[in-house]
Amino acid sequence: MKKTIALLLCLCMLACLFVGCASTSTTEKPTSETTTTETAASGTSASGNKVLKIGIFEPLTGDNGAGGKQETLGPQYGNYVQPTIEIGGETYDIQLEIVDNRTTAENGPSAASELVNRGVSIVLGSYGSGVSMAGGKVFEEAGIPAIGIGCTNPQVTSDCSVYFRVCFLDPFQGSVMASFAMEEFGAKKAYVLSMLGDDYTVGLAKNFVIAFEAAGGEIVADETFVEGTADFSAYLNNAVAGGADVIFAPSAIAYAPQIIEQASALGISLPILGGDTWENSAISDAQNGTDMQVFVSTFFDESDESGLAKEFVTGYKAWLNGNSQNLTNNGGNDVVAAVSALGYDAYMTAVAAIEKAQSTDGTAIRDALAGLSIDAVTGSISFDANGDAIKSTAYIKQAIDGGFQFYKVQNAD
């Protein structure tokens, strides 16, 4: 009898093992989640209200994962502040559909299609211009408007009729950093480094070069590195050998710390300038304990007490500190990243457009966006004919002592 029981137990264990193996899928799909009240099959939430879906198209993994998480926090806080909307006399619960586009342009279309299939009325994102351009084609075909948060390449909107954005553009940002390099450091020569195949970094580098040369400066070298590069010593030595006064290196967050740390190890004291993606704790941590001068251009500073900024900063910090996962996604601290403030503004802009349209239809919302003008945390927002926010100011911050300090407001010449 004991042998029979033992045999039966072994057979049961084997059966469970095969069932477990059979349930494992190797098909890779965009990572996704839904926030706020889950939608029932009827299209209503647990509260009984109808549901309006806003898609969040962001990199939660990959080279831009850290920045994508910070950018996602903005709409999440916006949804916390305003979780419902009135359309046609009815209350709708606003539900965020979050899909990970995994940073790269190759993954953009599948992540965008996932949002379309979920029935979103409008999309927010992405952190990263290349993936935004790739996803934009899908949104355009589906007739779903999108609001870029921190994607600064001009082609995001110029090549897509449904894309808007709340940030400034690379031609402006490149000009701002060129002016800063010349005014602050008296730079006459600059070395430029970007990542090959990355639309954001290559585009921003190009605009810096154009502005710097137009102002009479000399580019000693304009070089690119390939994805996965770990040793930047040859590039950094080229900057020194060329007699550069500054280094402009607008790379993804994944590479910036290595550039800073290796420059310090080589004893290079040249100021290193980055773009908006560099406003991340990984960069300030890399600078901490070194003498490196690291400066970034960005969209917002939490010390700004004008307009809606002070109220936003107070509420946002309380919200971050009330949830450990939010803090983790923000880099483990409650410093307000500029892309988070922009993300909040993008959410509120979308809500304002939907309220104006009084519709969940994408075309109606897109038309409402075109003529919209609102006061926002990062300044007033209205759009030009391309769908670009009209911006004329950038904030320069310095990475120092493990954080970022406001340095100055910089305009392009």
Feature-to-residue mapping (PLM):
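An alpha-beta-alpha
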Residues: 163-227, 246
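Extracellular/periplasmic bilobed ligand-binding domains
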Residues: 138-142, 207-302
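Beta-alpha junction/loop-to-helix N-cap segments that form part of ligand/metal-binding clefts
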Residues: 66-73, 85-157, 166, 225-232, ...
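Bacterial lipoprotein signal-peptidase II cleavage site
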Residues: 18-32
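Segments of small-molecule ligand-sensing domains
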Residues: 324-341, 349-403
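Extracellular/periplasmic periplasmic-binding protein-like sensory domains
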Residues: 263-342, 398-400, 404-411
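Short beta-strand elements at the ligand-binding edges of bilobed clamshell
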Residues: 100, 156-180, 222-224, 288-303
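Extracytoplasmic "Venus flytrap"
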Residues: 48, 55-76, 99-105, 128, ...
